[in-house]
Amino acid sequence: IAAGGFFDGRGLVAALAYGASGVAMGTRFLLTSDSSVPQQVKDYYLTKGVLDTVVSTQVDGVPHRVLRTELVDQLESGTGKVFALPRAALNALRFKRLTGTPLAEMLKEGLAMRKSLDLTWAQMVMAANTPMLLKASLVDGKTESGVMASGQVVGVIDDLPTCADLVHRIIDEASSVLDSLTAK
């Protein structure tokens, strides 16, 4: 399955030509009228361009492409790092409360992640941020205080079709591209 930058039928055909079995379209399907993300968050995404994303390791030590927000810019510049550790600890407790995951299990998972990804202690603790920061934006609608995962394709998406309409559009576009290629 190919992923990264796919949002239409042309991309699907290109990926299939390269040997993929299919494509993942995370940002494209996030931005549909059927998506459970709050409307104000979808509207926020629709205002963003292709240069409004950044690959950041500052949230949890692992590279993620996210929308540039005030919080992300603070983390990237270092001005948000002063409060990162206390915030991560608070978020770990919130995550425990939200999921019922015992702290010992969270610590065990964190230590395994630290070892396998060669993370620092700070990065390991900050990994507790990710679920709560994603929830803040994508569930609670707090675009200013959360982290919003996004592909660069966010800058070329300008509508919120239903998932059914989007799938039909992608199929129609892919068929059109294939027809034009076989006609040559």
Positions of predicted regions on the chain:
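Conserved active-site-proximal phosphate/metal-binding subdomains
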Residues: F7-K184
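Short beta-strand/loop segments at the ligand-binding rim of alpha/beta enzyme cores
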Residues: I1-A3
